[in-house]
């Protein structure tokens, strides 16, 4: 008949309330928060009777250790106690208050309210589902490629392989086939495919090469005749204007001039005038022109009575061309 033992949560409560294990105390009894000494065995000053007392008591309670029968193994005691604490559904670690390093390392835990029957059922169903998933994964892992290779290696082949080889031909049959087969000329390999080339576009160095040199066509005879007619008409119009303007030759002090002012008298009034060439003088602008002689000495006061209606300042004297 199996021996019934106390569960871990009530056993822990009893150990905390007994105050027999150093460092195992309540931090907040109302919230059920307590601490457990968790000093590492490699730290200086570690004592098996002081720092591993709780883990040894739990090993004795579970029957995994009996004094005098086995060698003390504090490392295994601590690992078993940690796994048992993590498996409890109603105890959780308060990680923000725990200290895992140093000589004063402790772990802080909180005892939660006891689970109801419904919560226990849900937890059991969840654990069963997890166990089934693990079993499926394990079965899938067993059917690895190694099993297939083992199955292939276990299959044996027959010792007699004569059925796999083709039957040999008789030499006489081969000679008959060669006689019946027409002589084949050596195959001449000829490629009928066009050569594959990459199209390359040649671009001229300058834009002047893009346009061809072109010569303008010569004008037709009809167009040339039209231009000559227009030039001839222009000359005739100029001559008519000169005839109608009434230019008259005059001679003053032996110098010849042309006058077109209204009211001008014929040459008989002024006397005999003759045209005379004037020397060519270079003008400031670089042009060659004809200038008249000095007319300061000429007395023209008698012309005031004859040419009263005429505005003398507007008279323009033009020398005769040679």
From Swiss-Prot:
Post-translational modification remark: Phosphorylated by CK2 and this positively regulates its activity. Sumoylation represses the transcriptional activity and displays enhanced resistance to protein degradation. Sumoylated by UBE2I/UBC9 and SUMO1. Inactivates the tumor suppressor activity. Elevated levels in tumor cells. Major site is Lys-276. Sumoylation is enhanced by PIAS3. Desumoylated by SENP1 in tumor cells and appears to compete with ubiquitination on C-terminal sites.
The main location class comes to nucleus
One GO term (biological process): CD8-positive, alpha-beta T cell differentiation
Q: Which GO terms describe its cellular component?
A: chromatin; cytoplasm; nucleus
**Stretches the record annotates as Disordered:** 92-164
- Gene Ontology MF terms in the entry: DNA-binding transcription activator activity, RNA polymerase II-specific; DNA-binding transcription factor activity, RNA polymerase II-specific; RNA polymerase II cis-regulatory region sequence-specific DNA binding; transcription cis-regulatory region binding
Respond yes or no to whether keyword Thylakoid is given for this record.
no
- Ranges annotated as biased composition (Polar residues): 141-157
Q: Where in the cell is it found?
A: Nucleus; Cytoplasm
Q: Which residues carry this modification: N6-acetyllysine?
A: 78
| Domain of life according to the entry | Eukaryota
Kindly indicate whether the keyword Isomerase belongs to this entry.
no
Q: In which residue ranges does the UniProt entry place its DNA-binding region annotation?
A: 5-113
Q: Which family does it belong to?
A: Belongs to the IRF family.
Q: What does this protein do?
A: Transcriptional regulator which displays a remarkable functional diversity in the regulation of cellular responses. Regulates transcription of IFN and IFN-inducible genes, host response to viral and bacterial infections, regulation of many genes expressed during hematopoiesis, inflammation, immune responses and cell proliferation and differentiation, regulation of the cell cycle and induction of growth arrest and programmed cell death following DNA damage.
The annotated subunit structure for this chain is: Monomer. Homodimer. Interacts with EP300. Interacts with MYD88. Interacts with PIAS3. Interacts with SPOP.
Q: What is this protein called?
A: Interferon regulatory factor 1
> Which species?
Sus scrofa
